Amino acid sequence: MSLLSKTRELNTLLQKHKGIAVDFKDVAQTISNVTVTNVFIVSRRGKILGSCLNELLKSERIKDMLEDRHIPREYTEELMNVKQTESNIDIDNELTVFPPENREVFLNSRTTIFPILGGGERLGTLVLGRVQDDFNENDLVLGEYAATVIGMEILREKHNEVEKEARDKAAITMAINSLSYSEKEAIEHIFEELGGTEGLLIASKVADRVGITRSVIVNALRKLESAGVIESRSLGMKGTFIKVKKDKFLDELEKK
């Protein structure tokens, strides 16, 4: 397969995900297919965003790492110290992705590391490993292109997260501001009663304890639910199950 064909295969994957978040496991699988390598896509804090492993699955340590979804802190730090592409790293180098304890199995292995950059900052690392055969110039071009694409996707996800947080905060603020004084007081007592972000509420019990009518509680919950801040489900005589849908709601409630 030519370099152009391999590049197009990566582009095809991205076009399939246009407008939605890319699954980095799919990206890792595609990179593995076109480069014939073991692949790790790692965040700057060592979280495994995506991987596609073949020979490396023979190592129990690698299997444990995949279960934890994190690479060791020491290796993360070593990767972050790599400022530009480093290719054809052998098994005796501390940057090798292959487990040194299996040195005899991976004696001819080669590791290549591509820093993932975007928006003027380091976002993570693309690590490719081959059991044998050096990485050639075409491999390096493809790897650097893949790292650039991954960086763009990570930035897009970050941007989407910031936008979602802003929308959630606006919805929470509007919902809290729509409450009357007594309704806000009722909500504060409800979550004090629940002791967390979800639980079973008996409205009459809270109403009697606080000295407000049950209708105030019902109206307050209805306003929050219509704003998408909470969800509630009646369980009949048992009460009402309540769950917070917006993570920052309780923090914002305390501030108001």
UniProtKB/Swiss-Prot annotation:
DNA-binding region, residue intervals: 203-222
Record SUPFAM superfamilies: Winged helix' DNA-binding domain
InterPro entries: CodY, GAF-like_dom_sf, GTP_trans_reg_CodY_C, Transc_reg_CodY_N, WH-like_DNA-bd_sf, WH_DNA-bd_sf
Superkingdom of source: Bacteria
Keyword Ribonucleoprotein applies: no
Localization terms from the record: Cytoplasm
Any GO BP: negative regulation of DNA-templated transcription
Gene3D superfamilies attached to this UniProt entry: 3.30.450.40, Winged helix-like DNA-binding domain superfamily/Winged helix DNA-binding domain
Family the UniProt entry places it in: Belongs to the CodY family.
Protein's name according to its UniProt entry: Global transcriptional regulator CodY
UniProt source species: Staphylococcus epidermidis (strain ATCC 35984 / DSM 28319 / BCRC 17069 / CCUG 31568 / BM 3577 / RP62A)
Gene designation: codY
